[in-house]
Amino acid sequence: MQNIYKILFFIIIALTFSVDSDGDGYSDKIERKVGTDPNNKSDRYYYGFWPFNLNKDKIRGAEIPIECPSNISCECSQNSDCINNNCQKTLRGEGPYCTPKVGDIFPHLIATDQYGEYVDIYDLGMQGKTIVIEFGAAWCNPCKQISSWLSTGDVSSLQNYSWWKEEYRAIRDKINHDEIIFVTILFQNESRENANHETVFNWHEKYPNENVLVLADEYRDIYFWLKPSGYPCINILDENMKLITFTGRGLSDAFDILSDLKPYPN
């Protein structure tokens, strides 16, 4: 009987902490913590309804701008120079640099979204969901076609690519059903100038999807961290912001996992 009371107690506590009186996606506990009105849906932390992570300080990724030496993106000559013991040349033969690898924590980016708000990317963590990071540019045609598909569901422009698989259609459904978190980070506009709020605002206007967070890599911090050699460059993170995949170009590994063609690595 005591066990039953304990179970009921924990259920009541859990329900108390998950109450969302105004239905804005933020629990009353979070709203009281951040100072928004738990009974007013229009008074919320993020206009875009992005998650809020009360425990984001526990994510120990590198702060931006990245400080050298030793951190990922810094120059190196041997593995021991790097905090992650991974000194590599880029696919273009540049470097070597301390290079990201699976298990590394994505850096602590705070950037402007399509609604003009600064979003802390660590707020996406600890939500029990996979986080998809698409890195690209506004001039990148495949990036445009992927965002068009995510907006409309039309895959016709993607079916001409050799890397496209019909199983990838499931990814859009997972995004729209809030099963995964999808982030598009743009580092350049159509004129190949540094991205800013106008860049991501225009992107969202062209390819609207309220479930896709679009961020501007205004100072190229993520560009220098990833050192991509092709676009889009898509990787996935676990809920602790650790890389599940890492590539400097392409999307196949990430999309194969997201569409259940491959299992999540142990």
Predicted feature residues:
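Thiol-/selenol-based redox modules, centered on thioredoxin-like
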Residues: 229-266
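Extracellular calcium-associated, cysteine-rich motifs in secreted modular proteins
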Residues: 17-101
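Hydrophobic h-region of N-terminal signal peptides that target proteins for export
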Residues: 9-18
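Loop/turn elements at helix/coil->beta-strand transitions in domains of secreted/extracellular proteins
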Residues: 23, 126-132, 176-183, 208-213, ...
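Sec-dependent signal peptide recognition
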Residues: 2-10
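Conserved redox-active cysteine motifs that mediate thiol-disulfide chemistry
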Residues: 135-167, 191-192
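A short beta-strand-turn-helix
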Residues: 110-131, 165-175
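Short, internal strand/loop/helix patches
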Residues: 181-185, 193, 197-231
